[in-house]
Amino acid sequence: MKTSRLPIAIQQAVMRRLREKLAQANLKLGRNYPEPKLSYTQRGTSAGTAWLESYEIRLNPVLLLENSEAFIEEVVPHELAHLLVWKHFGRVAPHGKEWKWMMESVLGVPARRTHQFELQSVRRNTFPYRCKCQEHQLTVRRHNRVVRGEAIYRCVHCGEQLVAK
């Protein structure tokens, strides 16, 4: 999905949130960090990614469109926090104490590492596997690891090894 397919109102709301949180951080930190580049090119099940070297935030347009309010409230500050931590502290753990501090104390947003958005529309192919108690859907990546003999997956409920159907 290209940026042009995202309604302009959603793009504007994303920019408002980004600028609001950046201004808040600059004020609290006594700095003048620049506005990062923003693109809507993230694919797959990730809501967004922060690219440190290029100082860029990439957002998933499908998840943004399907979860606009929560996405703008949580994901935009989450990715901005990664860039601000990198500028402020240098290279540290991605969701470490510095990031948590930046999220909660500086940006005033709960520090959650993962989103809870429905992923059905962005999931690619899955492969059916079975155990004693249920059927599981493995991602392409996990399926390929099983095929290459690089991984064995077990059911979290019964503990049995998953077998392709």
Swiss-Prot record:
Active site: E79
GO function term, MF aspect, one: zinc ion binding
GO cellular component, one term: cytoplasm
Keyword Iron assigned: no
Primary localisation category: cytoplasm
Sorted UniProt keywords: Cytoplasm, Metal-binding, Zinc
Similarity comment: family membership: Belongs to the SprT family.
Protein name: Protein SprT
Gene: sprT
